[in-house]
Curated annotation (Swiss-Prot):
This is 11-beta-hydroxysteroid dehydrogenase 1. Keywords: Endoplasmic reticulum, Membrane, Oxidoreductase, Transmembrane, Transmembrane helix. One of its GO terms (molecular function) is 11-beta-hydroxysteroid dehydrogenase (NADP+) activity. It comes from Bos taurus (Bovine). Pfam families: adh_short. Homodimer. It is a single-pass type II membrane protein. PANTHER family: 11-BETA-HYDROXYSTEROID DEHYDROGENASE 1, HYDROXYSTEROID (11-BETA) DEHYDROGENASE 1-LIKE B-RELATED.
Amino acid sequence: MAFMKKYLLPILGIFLAYYYYSANEEFRPEMLRGKRVIVTGASKGIGREMAYHLARMGAHVVVTARSEESLKKVVSRCLELGAASAHYVAGTMENMTFAEQFVAKAGELVGGLDMLILNHIHYTPLGVFSNDIHLLRRTLEVNLLSYVVLSTAALPMLKQTNGSIVVVSSIAGKIACPLVAAYSASKFALDGFFSSLRMEYEATKVNVSITLCILGLIDTDTAMKAVAGIFNAKASPKEECALEIIKGGTLRQDEVYYDSSILTPLLLRNPGRKIMEFFFLKKYNMERFINN
């Protein structure tokens, strides 16, 4: 009986919560009304669609990407759709100073922050890895390091609002995929960093959620051009994908899976990992790090 109380019941609780709790939460668009949200990589594709969804929900939206002309159009459309306010800051996430300063600027523009959606990537064409260390370094800097810089800069504001960090990742960050070695490495690294960070937040009483979004092939122009004639799979609609990302972040889910195949979440969700993390965390004395 003691063994059951100490081990089996917590395991069962984790398993049930992992599979059912988040799915049973009800999302309502009004949850985003008046919320202050940053979306990176928002000049096109999934990022642009997220900005439009947030605008329809009445959020304050701050978007960033490299193309100022594209961002101007996104902001104009957001205002037409009903955004409480919409702003843009153009720049490249290859520049870590810009990444840090962008968060501060965004906070000034909308008076704080409730949600940070990290969506930008460094484009890497499909191909066999040919020892291009420069490409690998640049991919890791944009796809990983800038995410760390942005989330670190945003944390003080997110702590004030019990906010959320939403990290857009990929199936290529959960399973091995050919022709995308550098990209895949950056996405696996996102899982490792932000999943560990989530555990630290929970253990040290930081009420900021982290949602990792694992996406399959999405029908963005960039993705469709990249995989043409190489990868044979059904692409999912970017509009619906964008909405699912927003829902998952708003409901503070640990992970969101979005793919054309219903098997993807069934096969990739890993209750064994959650159980291991639960018991591993108990081996640490985290009290000394609370409020530090």
